[in-house]
Design a protein with these regions (language model features):
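The catalytic Nudix box helix
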Residues: 38-76
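Short connector loops at helix/strand junctions that flank enzyme active sites
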Residues: 8, 38, 97-101
Length: 148
């Protein structure tokens, strides 16, 4: 069965603590490359609310309940429009070359457990926000970290 094409509208969720340490996760599909990033993911349906996409992706990628009592999910009201990386172009319908990314923040307790989905990510690290920005492969992700 063929997978449906991805919707070119996604979220970027900067997971951080009150002390401004940022959770970065390493992509498992990046081969030998060091693709560190925050939580990202596309909408599952055109009418899926962005906050739902953000909470769902955080749960799928890290095991963190973004709507839990000790967490605060915030829509930063920032949109980035960028060219889809060539290595991931085939996931989108023919002719789709750009993605609209919506930025969220998620403040979590420092001791929140992280449970990665090994099909998507191979490692995680908590870093002070400036160091996290330096490690991100995506410029929009780095900029979002620096907004903390």
């Amino acid at each position: 069965m063929l997978k449906p094409f991805k919707i070119p509208e996604s979220v970027l969720v900067v997971v951080h603590t009150a002390a401004l340490d940022v959770l970065l996760i390493r992509r498992a599909d990046a081969g030998a490359d060091e693709f560190w990033q925050s939580v990202t993911g596309s909408k599952d349906a055109l009418d899926e609310p962005l906050a739902h996409t953000a909470a769902r992706e955080v749960g799928e990628e890290t095991g963190i309940d973004a709507l839990g009592p000790d967490c605060a999910l915030t829509d930063w009201r920032i949109e980035n429009l960028y060219d889809i990386y060539p290595r991931w172009q085939a996931r989108y319908a023919p002719g789709v070359t750009r993605n609209r990314e919506h930025v969220f923040g998620l403040c979590v307790p420092r001791d929140v457990p992280v449970l990665l989905n090994p099909r998507e990510h191979s490692d995680f690290v908590w870093l002070p926000y400036r160091e996290a920005a330096d490690r991100c492969f995506s410029p929009s992700n780095a900029e979002a970290c620096l907004l903390l």
